[in-house]
Amino acid sequence: MKEAYLYIVEKSVAWEFDSPEYGRLARKVVELLYERKEDLSDDRVAIFLNISTAETRRILQYLMKQNMVGVKKRTTEDYRIEYTWYVDDEIIRQAIKNRAKVAKEKISSLIRSLTEGAYYICPTCHMRYTLDEAINYGGVCPVCGTQLEYVENTEEINKLTKVYEEVDKI
């Protein structure tokens, strides 16, 4: 389960910041938080990993918004607000559960759209068109001019249903 969580963190951050390097950095941040089993400030995380505090904060705040790390807020003796970050098994479980829920919703939506209408595909450029779009284009692909072909959706629907059932087990 931990590997799946680390993969989700890495890919999510890499996608958000359009940087595979940031994804790998986020993976290191959450690995550190999980292995140390203690609440750490962003400054301490930055020191442990030898990276800038700004990068650390940016990654941690994104992960917090995605519910992939836990955060605790406390006021210091000199009335400053200090945030500490942590990752535990419950955070990992919830992150995977939330990601599975989003995936199920997308798959369900795709299955619904495939069952509700007929689709045509261009055999050359593989663009997919609804029945209405195919009629509007006269049965010809507007991108490359090739004749559109009807797609039998049952095989795709069956595959997506199996994937949905697998995700539902999580």
Curated annotation (Swiss-Prot):
All residue ranges annotated as the HTH TFE/IIEalpha-type domain in the record: 1-93
GO terms of molecular function: DNA binding
The entry's keywords: DNA-binding, Transcription, Transcription regulation
UniProt entry tagged with the keyword Nuclease: no
Pfam families membership: TFIIE_alpha
Transcription in keyword set: yes
GO biological process, alphabetically ordered: regulation of DNA-templated transcription; transcription initiation at RNA polymerase II promoter
Alphabetical list of SUPFAM superfamilies matching this protein: Winged helix' DNA-binding domain (SSF46785)
Subunit structure: Monomer. Interaction with RNA polymerase subunits RpoF and RpoE is necessary for Tfe stimulatory transcription activity. Able to interact with Tbp and RNA polymerase in the absence of DNA promoter. Interacts both with the preinitiation and elongation complexes.
Free-text note on domains in this protein's UniProt record: The winged helix domain is involved in binding to DNA in the preinitiation complex.
Function (record text): Transcription factor that plays a role in the activation of archaeal genes transcribed by RNA polymerase. Facilitates transcription initiation by enhancing TATA-box recognition by TATA-box-binding protein (Tbp), and transcription factor B (Tfb) and RNA polymerase recruitment. Not absolutely required for transcription in vitro, but particularly important in cases where Tbp or Tfb function is not optimal. It dynamically alters the nucleic acid-binding properties of RNA polymerases by stabilizing the initiation complex and destabilizing elongation complexes.
Family classification: Belongs to the TFE family.
Protein name in UniProt: Transcription factor E
Lineage per the UniProt record: Archaea, Thermoproteota, Thermoprotei, Thermoproteales, Thermoproteaceae
Gene: tfe
